Amino acid sequence: DCVGESQQCADWAGPHCCDGYYCTCRYFPKCICVNNN
């Protein structure tokens, strides 16, 4: 399973972002998926 835009993700142990998104932790302490365009 994957999570979409603005959904919480984890770099190390999931959940991971869907294709087209990557996990960023710049919104610390929460990591979220953002579009990789």
UniProtKB/Swiss-Prot annotation:
Transmembrane segments: none
Record organism: Agelenopsis aperta
Organs and tissues of expression: Expressed by the venom gland.
Entry keyword DNA damage: no
Domain observations: The presence of a 'disulfide through disulfide knot' structurally defines this protein as a knottin.
Signal peptide coordinates: none
Key words, A-Z: Amidation, Disulfide bond, Ion channel impairing toxin, Knottin, Neurotoxin, Presynaptic neurotoxin, Secreted, Toxin, Voltage-gated sodium channel impairing toxin
Disulfide partners: C2-C18, C9-C23, C17-C33, C25-C31
Protein name, UniProt field: Mu-agatoxin-Aa1f
Molecular function terms, GO-annotated: sodium channel regulator activity; toxin activity
Similarity comment text for this entry: Belongs to the neurotoxin 07 (Beta/delta-agtx) family. 03 (aga-4) subfamily. Aga sub-subfamily.
Record flagged with keyword Secreted: yes
Job description of the protein: Insecticidal neurotoxin that induces an irreversible spastic paralysis when injected into insects. Modifies presynaptic voltage-gated sodium channels (Nav), causing them to open at the normal resting potential of the nerve. This leads to spontaneous release of neurotransmitter and repetitive action potentials in motor neurons.
Gene Ontology cellular component annotations, sorted alphabetically: extracellular region; host cell presynaptic membrane
Entry-annotated residues carrying Asparagine amide: N37
Subcellular localization(s) per the UniProt record: Secreted
